[in-house]
């Protein structure tokens, strides 16, 4: 599974958000659009109906929107509508982690309870599906979201000892990849993996004895998942007043 958090600078987080959002904008809105490509100050993102105009632009767009195109895909899509391709991708049934994970788990149980395969299965499934799954846009979108709404199985704690927890979390990202961000936030909030990762599992309210609730998740929700602490311009740079 994904174990690395993006550099948390405002510019890097803004680009990660732009990467996730770009698939739902001009080139991937499911409709033909004549609007100009969106301009982002940073690594460029191909959008608009010109995305499939040439073999080079097709390969570039698919490299951004999938885990990498095959030459046959580039040839067949060049000259067609990028919006139509995105609409077809969004209409595909989600490829979920759980079914393939269960298959690996069955093999692991044959080898014994402590089989290394059991703990490595989420990573095996991720790469297998990244290469072979037909709903590439959904998987790439879920991957972008996983770099923002981070949960990790690194560190030898519960999330690595119980690999099913990471499987369920990844499937939430895939099921909500093209949905409403508010709904996605609610889904991950009630997910045990996020509760364990950001330490609010079993959290209790404050009381007169001096007990205070763990506010780690509330802080992360505001600072990293939503509004942040600094108002940003569209290019990810801080919005200043009088140059400060």
Predicted segments with their positions:
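Bacterial N-terminal signal peptides that target proteins for export
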Residues: 2-15
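Hydrophobic helical h-region of N-terminal Sec-dependent signal peptides
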Residues: 15-21
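C-terminal motif of bacterial Sec signal peptides marking the signal peptidase cleavage site
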Residues: 24-27
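N-terminal module-boundary/linker segments of secreted carbohydrate-active enzymes
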Residues: 31-124, 128-132, 136, 230, ...
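Primarily short, surface-exposed interaction patches in extracytoplasmic proteins
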Residues: 72-74, 78, 114-244
